[in-house]
Amino acid sequence: MGEQEVVVPLVVVKMLEGRSVEQKRRLVRELTNVVMKYTGATEDQVDVMIEDYSKENWAKAGVLFYDK
């Protein structure tokens, strides 16, 4: 038989820019804990990516957040 495949959980957070590094640290820690709890993954297996977007690059209901 072959080797067992390891699936690494990846959480991608897309949000408007403006959060502090400390807020992002807390978010990443909490997300990692939740993923470990519900998937059985170890801490080293959980990846979290944060993608910050400016208000001129995000819209809701046809209106840029920049214009709100």
State where each predicted segment sits.
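A domain-level signal for the structural core that forms small-molecule/cofactor-binding pockets
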Residues: 2-68
